[in-house]
């Protein structure tokens, strides 16, 4: 009985302590959750301010005042993260050394843009634009023109004696030729346009060949992005292509641009919107058909390297809620770094209309991050409440069992005591009666 009762006592005391551990865990979780409630409130205020700043009725002075408050709020978010602690354990500042973490990409509010997350990268698909389409980019309205580049008329050249009529190009209702004349050359009977690479600064030329082939204008759009690019036909003619001339033609409060130019502008804005809150900005991934630095190919699909920001990894601690050393008695609590870097709003700006517009998405992500963390903490707290109830139940019943072995059964003993007491009193009564009878006989004899 002693061995069994001591084993039970060990379990009872361990479970009592485990229940207290769980209660301490609830207190720690409630401390973190309460701090995040204030972080949530500050982010909601920042969202309100960014939305206000994005409105065109605000002056630069107004936006500066808005930016001042946003700066104060981000500073306070960092302070809360750095100082919130329970029993000398900091709860919201993460743990370990700082590491680079990815920041979510954003679509810059562009219509029809699809972002497909692929870990460190995002596949971006832009809406295909056709002639006559209206598109809004960075708060400006554009109309897509009918070709991919503006082409000026071929300049006539002295000595040109072969008239041509190849690859007509229509720009804003005017028909242009790729080239109008080629000089005769006694060394060859043919011609072919040499294709220039994307963003080539060297002119494309027509070289004499032994076989006549049709010229191609594949890279017109790439030339379009380079002001002053030329195409020479032998040494007799020059064509200039300058897409910048398309940017500035008003058409019903819109600017006529090429589809490729629109893709370039959209790409640049997506990069800008996806770089908010980063230490290292997002970039377009360089590959065989996708130039990183200047978005030269600017097609409807490209890959974006996510921007990164440095902050500490999640804080993780275990609550031991059992009497045994079994690892299943551990409940793990994870709390992410909740400073401005971890929330993706580090250094966020809303002092221009466009920056404020992009800030709205970044703040929305931060709010979602805090909501997710609070939800996780709430789930842990609810679990701990059930754990405490179960532990208390086990303690109560184990204590009862141990008591039956180790302790006196007071009810049974009281029954026995009462019975024995009654019997003793009855015996005394009978003896007294017997003594009285003897006295009566003696009295008669006298």
Please give the residue ranges for each predicted region.
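Primary detection of the long, small/polar-rich alpha-helical "axial" segments characteristic
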Residues: 1-173, 185-188, 193-194, 201-446
């Amino acid at each position: 009985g002693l061995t069994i009762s001591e084993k039970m006592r060990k379990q009872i005391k361990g479970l009592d302590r485990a229940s207290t551990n769980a209660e301490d865990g609830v207190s720690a979780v409630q401390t973190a959750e309460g701090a995040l409630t204030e972080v949530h409130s500050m982010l909601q205020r920042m969202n309100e301010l960014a939305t206000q700043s994005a409105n065109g009725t605000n002056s630069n002075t107004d936006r500066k005042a808005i930016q001042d408050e946003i700066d104060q709020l981000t500073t306070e978010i960092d302070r809360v993260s750095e100082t919130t602690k329970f029993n000398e354990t900091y709860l919201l500042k993460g743990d370990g050394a700082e590491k680079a973490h990815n920041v979510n990409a954003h679509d810059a509010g562009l219509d029809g843009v699809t972002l497909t997350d692929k870990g460190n990268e995002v596949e971006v698909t832009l809406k295909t634009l056709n002639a006559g389409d209206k598109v809004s980019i960075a708060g400006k309205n554009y109309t897509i023109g009918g070709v991919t580049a503006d082409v000026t008329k071929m300049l006539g050249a002295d000595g040109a004696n072969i008239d041509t009529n190849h690859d007509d190009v229509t720009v804003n209702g005017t028909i242009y030729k790729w080239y109008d004349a080629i000089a005769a050359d006694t060394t060859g009977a043919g011609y072919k346009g040499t294709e220039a690479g994307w963003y080539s600064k060297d002119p494309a030329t027509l070289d004499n060949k032994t076989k006549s082939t049709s010229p191609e204008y594949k890279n017109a759009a790439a030339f379009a992005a380079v002001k002053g690019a030329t195409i020479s036909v032998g040494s007799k003619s020059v064509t200039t292509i300058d897409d910048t001339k398309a940017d500035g033609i008003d058409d019903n409060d819109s600017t006529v641009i090429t589809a490729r130019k629109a893709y370039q502008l959209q790409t640049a804005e997506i990069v800008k919107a996806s770089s908010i809150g980063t230490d290292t900005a997002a970039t377009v991934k360089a590959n065989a058909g996708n130039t990183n630095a200047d978005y030269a190919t600017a097609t409807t699909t490209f890959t974006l390297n996510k921007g990164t920001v440095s902050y500490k990894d999640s804080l993780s601690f275990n609550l031991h809620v059992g009497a045994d050393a079994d690892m299943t008695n551990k409940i793990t609590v994870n709390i992410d770094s909740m400073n401005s870097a971890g929330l993706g709003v580090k250094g966020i700006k809303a002092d221009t209309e466009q920056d404020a517009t992009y800030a709205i998405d970044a703040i929305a992500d931060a709010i979602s991050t805090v909501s997710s963390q609070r939800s996780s903490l709430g789930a842990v707290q609810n679990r701990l409440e059930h754990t405490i109830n179960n532990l208390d139940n086990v303690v109560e019943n184990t204590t009862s069992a141990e008591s039956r072995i180790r302790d006196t059964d007071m009810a049974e003993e009281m029954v026995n005591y009462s019975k024995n007491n009654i019997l003793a009193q009855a015996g005394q009564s009978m003896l007294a009666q017997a003594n009285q009878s003897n006295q009566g006989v003696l009295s008669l004899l006298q």
